[in-house]
Regions:
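Glycine-rich adenosine-cofactor-binding loop
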Residues: 1-24, 37, 129, 148
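Alpha-helix C-terminal capping/helix-to-coil transition sites in glycosyltransferase folds
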Residues: 6, 66-68
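Residue-level detector of alpha-helix initiation sites
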Residues: 16-18, 78, 124
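NAD(P)-binding Rossmann-fold cofactor-contacting core
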Residues: 21, 29-47
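Short loop/edge segments at beta-strand edges and connector loops
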Residues: 37, 55-59, 98
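Glycine-rich, highly charged phosphate/nucleotide-binding loops
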Residues: 46-66, 74
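ADP-ribose/adenylate-binding Rossmann-like module
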Residues: 70-75, 81-106
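Adenosine-phosphate binding glycine-rich loop
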Residues: 109-148
Length: 148
């Protein structure tokens, strides 16, 4: 996702390593991020302390889905299902990291190359494969030798 507007933050629900990776991906794409979680990993705490993202230390609520147009659910499957029930009937589009088939969109593995934003996506079905392909293409574009 490449954000063209920074005045409308994207909600990330989940404060663990997946939430951190998705937050970094959104920040790299120019998005403004608001985090909601009962706890945050050290890397997210650092982003919060630096004022790079805003955060609320609590569980997700229906009002969050009414307030945000886009949300990333970086949660285990059961918590994702519970969050989707809260979201029902709102206009919020969601990316479901643990259950991609239930989401409305998926984030691309992305990077900057000159004036371009380049992204690779499996549509949420194989994030590890997308990350690996990103590394290969990025190395090629940057003229690095590839290991075989």
């Amino acid at each position: 996702m490449v954000a063209l507007r920074r005045d409308e933050p994207i909600l990330v629900v989940g404060g663990g390593p997946v939430g951190y990776r998705k937050t970094c991906s959104l920040l790299d794409g120019g998005a403004s991020v608001t985090l909601v979680s009962f706890s945050f990993c050290p890397e997210l705490r650092e982003l919060i302390a630096k004022g790079i993202v805003t955060a609320e230390e609590r569980g997700v609520q229906r009002g969050d889905f009414e307030r945000f147009r886009f949300a990333v659910l970086a949660l285990p499957p059961e918590e994702t299902r519970a969050a989707l029930e809260l979201r029902e009937g709102t206009q919020c589009l969601v990316c479901c990291c643990s259950l991609p088939e239930l989401g409305d969109f998926a984030l691309a593995a992305q990077w900057n190359h000159g004036n371009f934003r380049v992204g690779i996506s499996s549509g949420g079905t194989d994030p590890a494969g997308a990350a690996k392909l990103k590394g290969l293409i990025r190395a090629f574009l940057e003229g690095k030798r590839l290991r075989r």
